[in-house]
Amino acid sequence: FLTHDHHDHTAGAVELAQRSGAPIYGPKLEMGADTSGGTFKVDYLLEEGLLYPFEGAPIFEIYKLPGHSSDSLGILLSEEQLMFVGDVVFRHGPTVVFHPDGNLADYLASLDLLEDLVNLGKVNVFCPGHGHPIVDPLRSIRATRNHRIERLDQVKQALAAGVSRDADSLFDAVYEGVDEHLRWASLRSIEAQLVYLDSEQSEGL
């Protein structure tokens, strides 16, 4: 099962399928565009709202969770109240909104959807694509949302103070203390924030 089309999730899919004989399920028919091995076709397309029963295994239900990427999705094991959330939420800290494919408005809406699923009692545990399971999902959702809004406010303040409207300048002004090796990923999120602010301004006119 592939939750989204990023190389750290798709790179070994074909080899694993060949060795195990297992089919590949994914959110797009063709995946792996950013891997050195090139693209590959999935065996089955994961579509929102569909139930995927397997003999002797739990039933999976699919939810679209765009934002980190446009194709991100969650895989819910209803009976276990457990959801694989890909890179949408982590226990150890925030994820990246990968502009231009990722979108901050979509990401915040996906957090709202996850919060609703938890409040409805459909999910008790998140299993992210990196790190440990999240056994207190509401806390992680709210911490993640608060972080994104705080960063957005910091970008607004930096722009108001005269910082140049480009991602590199804003990184230097806002992301003080963030390790330099995270610059590239942070720049993607900053660009997504700028798009969000432009949209917010347009809607306010």
Language-model regions, residue ranges each:
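Active-site HxH/HxHxD metal-binding segment of metal-dependent hydrolases
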Residues: 1-58
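Histidine-centered divalent metal-coordination motifs
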Residues: 3-9, 68, 130, 193
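Aromatic/hydrophobic pocket-lining residues that form the small-molecule binding cavity
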Residues: 10, 107, 111, 190
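Residue-level signal for inorganic ion chemistry
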Residues: 16, 130, 155, 197
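Short, leucine-enriched amphipathic alpha-helices that occur as contiguous helical runs
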Residues: 22, 148, 152-156, 187
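Short, solvent-exposed loop/turn segments at secondary-structure boundaries
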Residues: 36-40, 96-99, 139-140, 182-184
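Metallo-beta-lactamase
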Residues: 59-154
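C-terminal regulatory/interaction regions
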Residues: 157-205
